[in-house]
Amino acid sequence: MTNPAETARPERQRKPDWIRVKAPTSKGYGETRALMRELGLNTVCEEAACPNIGECWTKKHATVMILGDVCTRACAFCNVKTGMPRAVDPMEPINVATAAAKMGLEHIVITSVDRDDLPDGGAGHFVKVIKALRELTPNTTIEILTPDFRNKMEAAVESIVEAGPDVYNHNLETVPRLYPTIRPGARYYASLRLLEQVKRHDPRIFTKSGVMLGLGEERLEVHQVMDDMRSAQIDFLTMGQYLQPTPKHAKVIEFVTPKAFDAYGSIARAKGFLQVAASPLTRSSYHAGEDFRQMRQAREAQLAKAAQKA
C-alpha cells in the first residue's frame, strides 16, 4: 500500500513578510481594469500574476501585452498560457494608443507573448503599435519588452529600432547554467546579441534587461551576468525575486533578502549601469516611467561630464 506522505504534492515555500502585498481594491485599479476590458487589451500584469498589480493599476500604470494571450513557448517560470495563438488583432495598435491617451500616460510599456508561428515573430506588429502611439499620443515615451525573435532576430530588431522606441528591453531572466531547465526555448548568448544589435543600430535607444533571483543561481554567476550585460552596453538592469505562479512551475529555491538585493544593486552600479532597480518586488516595468526619467538624467549628466573633459 502506498504511503500518502510519499505521494503528496510538496508544499511551496511560504512567502516571507517582505514579499507580501495587499489585495487591490482602489478606484484607480477598477478604472484601469475596466478600460483594458473595454478595449479588449491584455496586460502582463494579469497574465503573469504580477504582485505589483494593485499599486500600478491604482496609479493607472499598466504594461500592455500585444499579439494575444497565448505563447508559443513554455518557460518554467512564466504564467502565460502556452499553445497555438489566435490571429493577430489588426485593431490592437490603435486600441493600445487609445488606452494610453485616455489614461494620460507619460510612459507606456509594451510587451508580447512569443509568436514563433509568425514569419517575423510579431516584429511588424510592434512597429505598428509604436507608430500608432507616436501619432495619437506623441508626448508619451515608449518602452518595449520583446521576445528573442528566434531565427528571425536581425530583421526583427532592425525594423523595431527604426520605429524609434525610447527604451528597448529584453530580459535575460536567469544565469546561463539554468537556461536548459528555466528558459529551454531560448539561448543566453542570442539574447545578449539581440541587445548588442539594438545599440549597433541606434546607440541613442536605452537598453534594459532583467534577471530573476531565487532559482538556484550562485552569487558569482549573477556578477558574471552583470559583466556580460555591460559588455553588451546595456544601460538598465532590473533584479527581482522569482515567485512560483503554480505548483507546475519551477520551484523557488531561495527567497533572497532585501539586504542581499541591496548588495547586488550596489555592485551593479559600480559596474557602470546608468540605472539599477533591485528589490524583491522589482519587475521589468515596475516604476518604469520614473526609472526612465532618472536614466535619461544620468545619461545627460554623463555626456556633460565627458564634454567638460574634452
Curated annotation (Swiss-Prot):
Residues 57-274 form the Radical SAM core domain. The keyword Transcription does not apply. Transmembrane segments: none annotated. SMART domains: Elp3 (SM00729). [4Fe-4S] cluster 1 binds at residues 45, 50, 56, 285. Its main location: cytoplasm. It is found in: Cytoplasm. One of its GO terms (cellular component) is cytoplasm. CDD domains: Radical_SAM. Its EC number is 2.8.1.8. Pathway: Protein modification; protein lipoylation via endogenous pathway; protein N(6)-(lipoyl)lysine from octanoyl-[acyl-carrier-protein]: step 2/2. It holds the Pfam family LIAS_N. It catalyses: [[Fe-S] cluster scaffold protein carrying a second [4Fe-4S](2+) cluster] + N(6)-octanoyl-L-lysyl-[protein] + 2 oxidized [2Fe-2S]-[ferredoxin] + 2 S-adenosyl-L-methionine + 4 H(+) = [[Fe-S] cluster scaffold protein] + N(6)-[(R)-dihydrolipoyl]-L-lysyl-[protein] + 4 Fe(3+) + 2 hydrogen sulfide + 2 5'-deoxyadenosine + 2 L-methionine + 2 reduced [2Fe-2S]-[ferredoxin]. Keywords: 4Fe-4S, Cytoplasm, Iron, Iron-sulfur, Metal-binding, S-adenosyl-L-methionine, Transferase. [4Fe-4S] cluster 2 binds at residues 71, 75, 78. Its cofactor is [4Fe-4S] cluster. GO terms for molecular function: 4 iron, 4 sulfur cluster binding; lipoate synthase activity; metal ion binding. Binds 2 [4Fe-4S] clusters per subunit. One cluster is coordinated with 3 cysteines and an exchangeable S-adenosyl-L-methionine. InterPro entries: Aldolase_TIM (IPR013785), Elp3/MiaA/NifB-like_rSAM (IPR006638), LIAS_N (IPR031691), Lipoyl_synth (IPR003698), rSAM (IPR007197). Belongs to the radical SAM superfamily. Lipoyl synthase family. This is Lipoyl synthase. It comes from Novosphingobium aromaticivorans (strain ATCC 700278 / DSM 12444 / CCUG 56034 / CIP 105152 / NBRC 16084 / F199).
